[in-house]
A protein has these predicted regions:
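Transmembrane helix-loop junctions and nearby membrane-interface residues
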Residues: 17, 21-25, 167, 171, ...
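Helix-loop-helix units of permease transmembrane domains in multi-pass membrane transporters
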Residues: 55-88
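Junction motif at the cytosolic side of a transmembrane helix
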Residues: 208-228
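N-terminal membrane topogenic signal
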Residues: 1-7
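Active-site oxyanion/phosphate-handling segment shared across diverse enzymes
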Residues: 160
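Secretory targeting signals
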Residues: 6, 12-55, 80-149, 155, ...
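Short hydrophobic, aromatic-rich alpha-helical segments embedded in or entering the lipid bilayer
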Residues: 170-191
Length: 228
């Protein structure tokens, strides 16, 4: 039988789908203006809790992770497996949000140009990279405390305040506090893609940030004493 947290994800997706069916008529310009807030705050907030409940919460409660380690699975492989789990789930959510937008466009007969479609796709790609970054950052606190709730709190706080704080620091010090972070690099990749410029190197910097978060997770997890 699937883990209890597994059912949270489809339930939330279904609720969002129903909500999308009753949206007011939209035009591309107003839609794209509101998309920025949705992708930076609303969507990460919506998906972090169900992802963590599904990937970490149930496993910690049931002891599945400890059992796997006791049977010889390395802690590094556990961390990587959980990272891939969150990667797949966050992608699933983003694809569903994109599908909701498409259904809304079809319902109100909104036809997008090729350029507009590419802008929407790049926005969702950046959103996916950010959500995975929030999950990878929050996972550090799970391995540090062995408590998924602490990870959720850390993730929600980072979603709510990280961009605001980093933007403030950058504007007041004129140092690239935001631009060099995972969030900033994801935004740079999106902007450069939209402008038709080179953007892949920004994705590589995002992957580097993932590696840093995974390294910290491994550092704390390897020091954690478990009752095997």
């Amino acid at each position: 039988m699937a883990k209890p947290g597994f059912y949270i994800c489809p339930l939330i997706l279904f609720a969002l789908f129903v909500y999308g069916l009753f949206q007011s008529p939209v035009e591309y310009d107003s839609y794209y203006d509101s998309l920025e807030i949705q992708l930076n705050y609303l969507y990460p907030f919506l998906v972090l809790l169900p992802i963590f409940t599904c990937v970490y919460g149930d496993e910690l409660k049931s002891g599945t992770m400890v059992t796997a380690i006791g049977r010889g699975l390395s802690r590094t492989k556990v961390i990587l497996a959980k990272f891939i789990d969150t990667l797949v789930l966050s992608l699933t959510f983003c694809l569903f949000f994109l599908l909701m937008d498409q259904i809304t466009f079809d319902r109100f007969s909104v036809v997008l140009t090729k350029v507009q479609i590419l802008r929407v796709l790049s926005a969702y790609l950046a959103c996916w990279l950010k959500i995975q970054g929030f999950c990878a950052f929050a996972a550090i606190f799970v391995y540090l405390t062995w408590n998924s709730s602490v990870g959720v709190i850390a993730g929600l706080i980072s979603i709510a305040f990280s961009k605001m704080i980093l933007d403030w620091l950058q504007s007041h010090t004129h140092l690239p506090f935001y631009d060099l972070t995972l969030l900033g690099q994801a935004d740079q990749a999106r902007r450069q893609f939209d402008a038709g410029n080179a953007w892949v190197h920004h994705i590589l910097f995002v992957l580097l940030w993932y590696a840093v978060f995974l390294a910290f997770s491994a550092l704390f997890f390897n020091r954690k004493e478990l009752d095997l």
